[in-house]
């Protein structure tokens, strides 16, 4: 389920923990989206915090290169990277968020899903965590300006975390 608004425990950084959960930001992108798949180049990022040693920027593996696969790969990798603690994944991808919420509700992806291999991998990673190490998802606004901060749509810490994953 989506997380409640962030309240940071005293002494903890807003971009590191929320309600006792490790916070991570994911993002993916692809250049050449109007080209055939063989000419596309996609990658993803994982951001755990400013200058965190486990931050990742990596190319998307495999022949199918797309922004959606890159976004989804980031969420899968983040879930796999922190198996022993509760996790809050913040993503700007509505597609990843919607599918992730279905997985968290116990829905099992089938072979007909676009990028079904990644959805099944994520579902397995989520099932293997157990109730003490739950994953929560939160949609964050991409491409923000001052008006988004003024209206409370996104916090500066969330925007900075999303930019680090970008």
Short names for language-model regions:
Residues 5-6:
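Metal-dependent nuclease catalytic cores that hydrolyze phosphodiester bonds in DNA/RNA
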Residues 87-100, 140-143:
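Acidic/histidine-rich, metal-coordinating catalytic segments
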Residues 23, 88, 136-138:
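A structural signal for isolated positions on well-ordered beta-strands in alpha/beta enzyme cores
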Residues 101-146, 150-152, 158-166:
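Two-metal-ion acidic nuclease core segments, chiefly of the RNase H-like superfamily
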Residues 78-82, 88-89, 124-130:
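Short, charge-rich binding segments
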Residues 9-85, 100-101, 159, 163:
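RNase H-like nuclease fold core
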């Amino acid at each position: 389920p989506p997380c409640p608004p962030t309240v940071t425990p005293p002494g903890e950084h807003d971009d590191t923990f929320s309600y006792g959960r490790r916070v991570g930001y994911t993002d993916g992108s692809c250049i050449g989206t109007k080209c055939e798949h063989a000419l596309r180049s996609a990658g993803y990022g994982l951001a755990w915090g400013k200058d965190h040693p486990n931050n990742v920027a990596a190319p998307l593996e495999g022949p199918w290169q797309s922004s959606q696969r890159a976004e989804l790969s980031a969420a899968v990798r983040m879930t796999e990277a922190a198996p022993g603690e509760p996790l809050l994944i913040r993503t700007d991808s509505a597609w990843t968020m919607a599918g992730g919420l279905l997985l968290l509700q116990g829905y099992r992806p089938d072979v007909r899903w676009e990028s079904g291999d990644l959805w099944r991998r994520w579902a397995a990673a989520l099932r293997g965590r157990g109730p003490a190490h739950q994953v929560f998802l939160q949609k964050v606004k991409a491409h923000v300006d001052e008006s988004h901060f003024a209206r409370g749509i996104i916090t500066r810490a969330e925007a900075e975390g999303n930019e680090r994953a970008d």
